[in-house]
Amino acid sequence: NVELVSGRLIDVDTLLVATGGYPEVDLARDAKLQIENGIKVNERLETSDPSIYAAGDCASFDHNGGFLRLESVGNAIDQGQTVALNIAGKKTNFNAKPWFWTEQFDQKLQIAGLCDGFTDIIERKVKNKVSFWYYRNEILLAVDSFNDPYSYMTVSYTHLRAHETYT
């Protein structure tokens, strides 16, 4: 049960505790870089000043007509590798392969892909494991899994690794 401030009790199967943040962009703004939900970058993670790169939680890239920041360790590593290749002169475009995990007490949440724009969702539940599979016109976009590493691994290693871009 979850007790609200009003004292009312609500039955829940799972409670997710999450926080969010805003990127610190003062230095980028002072450097006259473009800001759009973070430090705006192009496909090579260059800022509006091509001699400056941004990576990690602060980097905001074009995604489906908007600007997206992926706030996760995996994304920071992937973007850092792309920036390093570009600095070394190997022109490389960033290819977002979103994945995320967190453990909260005895619950494990894992996410692979992005579910924005989904048209259908399939729920798979077995005992204390549940996963949600997101599709757009029969194309798998993402999976959210709770205590179900098999579903997460299936999507992250077979589906996400096989695709070059996500729209």
For the regions a language model picked out, list residue spans one by one.
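Residue-level detector of beta-strand face positions
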Residues: 1-3, 40, 101, 132-133
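FAD-site-proximal beta/loop scaffold in flavoenzymes
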Residues: 2-3, 8-82
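Well-ordered beta-strand scaffold positions
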Residues: 7-8, 107, 139, 165
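Short acidic, gly/pro-rich beta-turn/loop elements at beta-sheet edges
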Residues: 49, 119, 153-155
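Single conserved hydrophobic/aromatic residue that forms the stacking wall/gate
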Residues: 159-167
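A short, polar/charged loop-to-alpha-helix boundary motif
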Residues: 150-160
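Mid-to-C-terminal Rossmann-like scaffold of FAD/NAD(P)H-dependent oxidoreductases
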Residues: 58-151
